[in-house]
Amino acid sequence: MKLSEIIQHAKGTVLNPSIMIHDYEIIGGCGSDLMSDVLAVVKPGAVLLTGLCNPQVVRTAQMADIRAIIFLRGKQPSTEIVALATQENIPLISTDMGMFELCGRLYRAGLHSFETNWNGFHE
């Protein structure tokens, strides 16, 4: 799924529009506020949905090769976080939606979940 489609589903606002995002292909997603969980399940090319709004989110995305971060519930990262993400070429998006709603919308739209292998659970 293209990142531009995800932004439409999220009714999101791009916080660092200097990054060209329309051709970004996203292969799956993960929703979490625990960055250790993200590192345990996410695969390169994912989008991360989180309510956590600190530099560790960008550092986690950098380490895990996450393509984009969506901040939930109207969270707005500081200018330092936006600058760090822009430097790392990681698009930041903000939405007023909560995690449960946005995860459901994206999954229903066809975005693969990277959380389905927890504790032996499989689709």
Name each model feature, range by range.
Residues 5-29:
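An N-cap/entry alpha-helix motif that binds or orients negatively charged groups
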Residues 21-26, 30-47, 51-123:
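Feature captures the catalytic cores and cofactor-binding loops of soluble hydro-lyases/lyases
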Residues 2-4, 98:
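Short, structural beta-strand-to-alpha-helix junction motif
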